[in-house]
Amino acid sequence: MVRPQLDDPLSCQRLLDQLKDLHEAGLRHLEVAWSSHAGWRRFVQEIQECCPRFALGAASVVAIEALDDLQSLDLAYAMAPCWDPALVGAARDLGQLLIPGVLSPTEVQQTTAFGCRLVKLFPAATVGVAYWKRLEAPLGPLPFVIAAGGLTTIDLSAWLGAGHDAIALGRRAIGDHGVDPVLLGWLNRS
């Protein structure tokens, strides 16, 4: 997940260059934190042009107005940091995949009852690597889960090994220092 500094063209260009490196290394899914900023759509379009193999999504979607941007840019999916049934329902009505964020057993149960087969455990680092499996005994079969929030490249093997279906990395994997070399190595091996 990337969160571009849309008021800083140099920062955006550096980020695009880093995304090209990740694209070439084989990264397949990328989320760009949604913003109502006028430059957000243009930034996403630039990624679509220079990295056509990315399945692009929007992260941090908490407003229904974001759904218009998702639709006009033909984004593959969106992720929310929280469980908002009205937002998930509105996305469904538009034929869009919005992955809700969950943390508590109640949220996991509610999203499952709502028909969500894919959820984002957020913030995952707060609850630890064993948390998700502990929910299985009281709740039964759990949905496909993407662990996100506070995780780094060092966490990849442990979290995937503990049964999380996917990991979303954020600012620590890419930033002013460049792309984390551990991530590039991991992508090149997979």
What residues fall within each predicted segment?
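Glycine-rich beta-to-alpha transition loops that act as phosphate-gripper elements at the mouths
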Residues: M1-D7, A58-I64, A80-W83, P100-P105, ...
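Histidine/lysine/aspartate-rich catalytic loop segments that bind and position anionic ligands
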Residues: P81-V127
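Catalytic cores of alpha/beta
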Residues: A63-L73, T106-G115, Y131, A137, ...
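Short secondary-structure capping/turn micro-motifs that flank functional sites
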Residues: H37-G39, E65, A86-L87, T106-V108, ...
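Conserved N-terminal beta1-alpha1 strand-loop-helix module at the mouth
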Residues: M1-A76, D93-L94, T153-I154, A173-S190
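Glycine-enriched alpha-helix->loop->beta-strand junction motifs that scaffold or abut catalytic
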Residues: H23-R28, C50-R53, S72-A78, R92-I99, ...
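Glycine-rich phosphate-binding active-site loops on the catalytic face of alpha/beta enzymes
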Residues: Y77-L87, K120-V129, A162-W186
